[in-house]
Amino acid sequence: MDYLQKKSIRSVAAAIAGFLRHCVRKIGITREKLPSCIALAVCPLVTFYLFEMYTHNPFTTMHFKTQILNMAFYVLTALLLFGIVKYVRVALMLQTAFFMAAGLANYYVLNFRSAPIMPWDIYSIGTAASVAGNFNYTLKGSTVLVIIGFLILLLIESRFHMKTPARVAKRAALILLSMALIYGYTGMVQSESFVRNFGLYDKLFTPTVMNKRDGNIVAFLMELEYMDVEKPSGYSPEETGSKYTQAGQDSAGLTAAVEDPESVKRSNIIVIMDEAFSDLAVRGDFTTNEDYMPFIHRLQQGAENTRTGYLNVSVLGGNTANTEFEFLTGNTIGFLPQGSVAYQQYVQKETPSLASYLKELDYHTVAIHPYYASGWDRDRVYPLLGFDEFLSQDDFTNPKRIRNYISDESSFAKIIELYENKKEGEPLFVFNVTMQNHSGYEEEFHNFTPDITVDGIDSKALSMYLSLVKQTDSALQGLIDYFSQADEDTMIVFFGDHQPTTYVSNPILRNNKVNPETLTDEENLLKYKVPYVIWSNFDIEEQTDGETSANYLAMDVLENCDLPLPALQSSLTGLRKEYPVISAAGVREADGTLTTVKQCGEALNDYRSLEYYLLFDYER
């Protein structure tokens, strides 16, 4: 431990010790009050350890100095509560009950989406509640023991009866000092110099590791700093707006196409972002009783008028809306706070997107999501992105269901229905976000029996997931078969929004002798890869080894449809050659080097400025 680290620890310890001495003097410790004072110092520490044990063993994942750092917060909040509620037992029991409930919630969230609770999840409560009934809430034995530990602690805390000083001034002093120290503590753990000198783990794109190493509270407070999007260095809305306008003017054929849409070829464009669809073979080798995606695997071997490859996305196991945000807008989540949901936080006005651009070309733009319309605020956001129409589960009549969700087969049938009933001569753009493959994967259902098994791996979740993927593969084949016979030129774009939560894929890693807890940066990036397919019933150049990211994929769609690129995509053509993959999970340089958005720094500043402008300063 270097000098600065030791100095940081001593500073924290000295501040808290001085504060406690002040409290002792003000309260006036007597023999009767001594047990309560000890409880006020010790019980918060027990609460800390129990809270961490919901998800990991802090004695093995956290340095002792980091444990001390976390304990300080618990002691300070206990003192603050003591000042507010007057009774030590009430203060301690309130703190313990809160962390017992919050820890259990964090345990479930981590299991369901492979990421802990983060500050931005407050925006997602409604969406989470809508799918809450589809998960398995069985507790592990170790988790039950943690809950029992909390209950015992609550019982012990109920026996202490010390009150705060009767004088209002002393209580106020205790409250104000506690608040001041908590405020200072928060600022300290958000300080880059403290994080660096203390040795905290600050890789926000791996929040699970961050929580295990830094502790849940310290990690949460560090993440709070990123609630707001900082302006890029040297940002000027006037200058950036001028660059954006110029990029549109420089895009070959864009102005003419917008002024006279009939002057360009306008094929129907169908985009399917399939829920949790991925090929877990990218994580490691495994053998199944039969191919779980035979149709897509055949396309990946090479097919006429077909382009296949892998898409790098910014999310894992959840936050679906961020992948659609990247695809539709051309922006990247990599410039936004880790864990944020762009739809709910940043799309508050009309925002340029693929839908709004195609609408300018007189396309009829339709979004489909066969679940609740309010999920991720889609019913509010889609009109702002330029969609003419939004069809949710309420617009399906007697659809086929797999488990509790509308099947991909029925979801794709809705696309065919739209095509067959569209106005003659009006091109159609459909963006379909499916639900069939949504987690969880451990329940049994009367209407679906998994038929894929994995040799040497006994995992109900993995078997369920691969069996669902097979259903999607079959539905996609049916859709492409239909449009291969269609009279109008049509392109179908298919990709997954993210891989499933890691409890599905971890058995594959372990079967390949890979520890999921000690992945290299390259291995970690594999968690963010999903396959994509671009197919058309007209001539396009074939490809089988594509590697891109969600923010760039719409460029491929437009270019292969012979449509001009809109302003943002036009401005990114040069950058894409230097950085063919940009996501929150990682950046791939042209020579194959893996880096991060943060490490790229000024190299991405023009892109960052354009994104900031479009989200916060752009006006149509």
Language-model segments: residues:
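Solvent-exposed, charged interface segments at domain starts and junctions
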Residues: R21-C37, T127-V131, V146-E192, G234, ...
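Short alpha-helical interface patches
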Residues: R113, D121-G133, G141-L145, M222-E225, ...
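General structural signal for secondary-structure boundaries
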Residues: R113-P119, Y137-G141, S233-A247, T320, ...
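Membrane-interface segments at or immediately adjacent to transmembrane helices
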Residues: T186-V271
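Transmembrane and membrane-interface helices of multi-pass
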Residues: D2-M210
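Alpha-helix initiation and N-capping motif
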Residues: I122-I125, D214-F220, M293, A321-E324, ...
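Solvent-exposed soluble domains appended to multi-pass membrane proteins
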Residues: A252-V264, M273-D274, D279-R620
